[in-house]
Amino acid sequence: MNLIQQLEQEEIARLTQNKTIPAFAPGDTVIVQVKVKEGTRERLQAYEGVVIAKRNRGLNSNFIVRKISSGEGVERTFQTYSPLVDSIEVKRRGDVRRAKLYYLRERSGKSARIKEKLNYKAPAAKKA
């Protein structure tokens, strides 16, 4: 392991020492609690939607969550190890055959539904 990878691993360990990141995949419905600063106040905002893409790149890992808000599709990219992401909760496991679900952007209504994965055996959540 080279020096940069070692430093990234140490930074990931530091950022995740008091929170756990569950194992989730594209197709899963997640609730992401995001820290939002409004003036002097800081509060948590829940963002619930379907994970349409996940990018595993160490410290630069991110994932895209898509939801329908007021009939309009909204996508938001979250950095997995960002201090602004307070927690990630998997609400429902989706059964999909693709790693990137960008085709959901063109679909709406019943054609955009994702089948639920039954009897899912989750790998252990990452605890650094």
Curated annotation (Swiss-Prot):
Keyword Zinc: no
Cross-referenced InterPro entries: Ribosomal_bL19 (IPR001857), Ribosomal_bL19_CS (IPR018257), Ribosomal_bL19_sf (IPR038657), Translation_prot_SH3-like_sf (IPR008991)
GO BP annotations listed: translation
Superkingdom in the source lineage: Bacteria
Keyword Ribosomal protein: yes
Keywords, sorted A to Z: Ribonucleoprotein, Ribosomal protein
SUPFAM superfamilies the record matches: Translation proteins SH3-like domain
GO molecular function: structural constituent of ribosome
Cellular component terms per the entry's GO annotation: cytosolic large ribosomal subunit
Physiological role: This protein is located at the 30S-50S ribosomal subunit interface and may play a role in the structure and function of the aminoacyl-tRNA binding site.
Family stated for the protein in its record: Belongs to the bacterial ribosomal protein bL19 family.
Protein name per the record: Large ribosomal subunit protein bL19
Name of the gene this protein is made from: rplS
